[in-house]
């Protein structure tokens, strides 16, 4: 975005941004205040504990183990603006040495009063053994005081550390979980397990707390509106691969340390693999332009409504009203299947395969969490693979790979590495050009017209020059195509000088006959009810709303970055 246009955005959205920011920050600020209060409470408790220890030691009535300082240490994790995503704070554990118990019956009576008949049978069984056991870990202040006031020599306490997740569900798939031994078992917690145990300062991520909150809020809303089984969205800088937001729903509360076996809770950005449909037509056309086989104005004649491909395989046009003569640009705008197949045949298998590999679609991405899927292997010479891949069928990939591919195609043709870790990089010196000059400029112009003239008009948010491509695909279950849909919209903005890629995916959506669509192009046009269960009426609508909300923040907070 040029400096002049950036200033226009700032002027147009300053008041709106301040209002939205204050409104959406309420929940975030409340969480922060609650978290700070909790940490203060813990610190106060530790101080009180030390006073109790002094008194107890003077009386000789309790035994206290040495304080644990580094045993369970893990570094904090913060977002790009210093907000805590994970925090390690002091806590305390209380245990019993059965061999030191003088009056077991009296001790059980006192503990029964404190715990109100809960866990007493477990405590009784443990007391009949000689081995030390923990009565309770991460004891609350009031409970700790009650236990220490018993003055029983068999009861001892030890300082410990507790891992808190103040944002609860917000970053669950990214941060991941730890086990009871304080070892990472998923997400960032696992991938950087050793580093988190050693570094002194916090681990800084590329994520933005406020943007993550807003995107998740909209995904939850549209998931409900279109009765989707799940949803996902990723916002990434197309020039350096920094991920500002990565949301996958449903999610979970990290503080509960639940074992989740439900496949519906997978990370849909990195772990789920999908046939994504017509978003692949962008790759087919970019491949042809990169090979100098076609240009946006190249015209294809005699485009039939269906073509034969191999034995008993027919490829049909999704729209019977599709014109028989289209330019390459029109094929993308109107999302033509047959036109895309004709382009792919001109490119050929080897060249198109190499192109998809170059932009990161065919290989597993080296990423900052372990939950990343490898794309399904493809036999390019079996049946009609080249033809179906041309319009996004017969090939599975992750949302993360899709975001990377769109970034390379639109950022001038430079390779990028998606990342969650904030680094100090000399971006220009490390960028590697992988596409020919001029490819991005031509593609960006066409992607913009998909939004202004084609299937993504609902994402035409004023002031942000959004470009993109829709994709509607039948979901594959046990190698069989079902009636459920995967609706995806890959968008780039601002298209004249691309900075962000936003991919929104809604899984297994349904039409909503009552929903009111409001076009964002300034026309004021409204429409009631979903005409079709396609990406243009589901994921595009969600993406348009997301850009409308986060746009002012991006235009102000990151204008110079």
Where are these predicted regions, by residue range?
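Beta-lactam-recognizing serine transpeptidase/beta-lactamase-like catalytic domain environment
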Residues: 6-7, 13-17, 84-86, 233, ...
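Periplasmic/cell-envelope proteins involved in peptidoglycan metabolism and beta-lactam response
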Residues: 1-257, 350-362, 480, 514-561
């Amino acid at each position: 975005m040029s400096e002049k246009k950036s200033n226009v955005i700032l002027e147009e959205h300053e008041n709106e941004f301040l209002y939205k920011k204050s409104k959406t920050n309420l929940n975030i600020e409340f969480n922060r205040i609650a978290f700070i209060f909790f940490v203060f409470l813990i610190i106060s408790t530790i101080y009180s504990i030390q006073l109790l220890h002094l008194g107890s030691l003077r009386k000789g009535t309790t035994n206290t183990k040495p304080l644990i300082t580094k045993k369970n240490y893990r570094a904090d994790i913060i977002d790009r603006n210093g907000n805590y995503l994970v925090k390690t704070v002091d806590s305390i554990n209380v245990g019993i040495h059965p061999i030191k118990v003088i009056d077991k019956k009296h001790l059980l009576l006192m503990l029964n009063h404190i715990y109100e008949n809960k866990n007493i049978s477990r405590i009784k069984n443990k007391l009949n053994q000689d081995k030390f056991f923990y009565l309770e870990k991460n004891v609350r202040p009031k409970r700790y005081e009650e236990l220490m006031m018993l003055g029983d020599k068999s009861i001892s306490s030890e300082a410990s550390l507790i891992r808190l997740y103040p944002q609860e569900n917000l970053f669950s798939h990214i941060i991941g979980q730890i086990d009871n031994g304080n070892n990472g078992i998923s997400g960032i917690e696992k991938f950087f397990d050793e580093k988190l145990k050693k570094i002194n300062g916090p681990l800084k991520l590329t994520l933005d707390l406020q943007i993550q909150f807003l995107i998740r809020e909209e995904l939850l809303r549209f998931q409900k509106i279109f009765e989707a089984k799940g949803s996902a969205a990723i916002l990434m800088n197309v020039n350096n691969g920094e991920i500002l937001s990565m949301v996958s729903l449903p999610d979970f509360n990290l503080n509960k340390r639940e074992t989740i076996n439900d496949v519906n809770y997978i990370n849909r950005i990195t772990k789920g693999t999908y046939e994504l449909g017509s978003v692949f037509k962008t790759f087919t056309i970019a491949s042809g332009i990169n090979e100098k086989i076609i240009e946006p104005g190249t015209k294809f004649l005699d485009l039939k409504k269906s073509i034969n491909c191999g034995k008993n395989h027919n490829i049909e046009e999704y729209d019977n009203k599709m014109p028989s003569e289209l330019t390459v640009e029109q094929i993308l705008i109107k999302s033509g299947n047959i036109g895309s197949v004709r382009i792919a045949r001109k490119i050929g298998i080897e060249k198109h395969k190499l192109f998809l590999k170059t932009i990161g679609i065919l290989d597993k991405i080296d990423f900052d969490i372990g939950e990343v899927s490898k794309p399904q292997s493809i036999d390019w010479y079996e049946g009609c693979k080249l033809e179906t891949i041309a319009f996004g069928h017969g090939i599975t990939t992750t949302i993360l790979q899709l975001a990377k591919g769109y970034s390379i195609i639109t950022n001038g043709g430079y390779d990028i590495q998606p990342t969650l870790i904030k680094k100090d990089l000399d971006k220009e010196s490390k960028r590697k050009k992988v596409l020919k000059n001029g490819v991005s400029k031509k593609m960006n112009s066409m992607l913009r017209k998909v939004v202004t003239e084609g299937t993504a008009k609902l994402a035409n948010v004023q002031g942000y020059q959004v470009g993109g491509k829709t994709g509607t695909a039948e979901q594959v279950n046990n190698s069989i195509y079902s009636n459920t849909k995967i609706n995806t919209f890959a968008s780039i903005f601002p298209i004249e000088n691309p900075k962000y890629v936003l991919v929104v995916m809604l899984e297994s959506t349904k039409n909503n006959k009552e929903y009111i669509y409001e076009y964002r192009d300034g026309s004021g046009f409204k429409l009631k009810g979903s005409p079709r269960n396609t990406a243009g009426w589901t994921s595009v609508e969600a993406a348009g709303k997301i850009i409308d909300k986060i746009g002012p923040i991006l235009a102000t907070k990151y204008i110079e970055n």
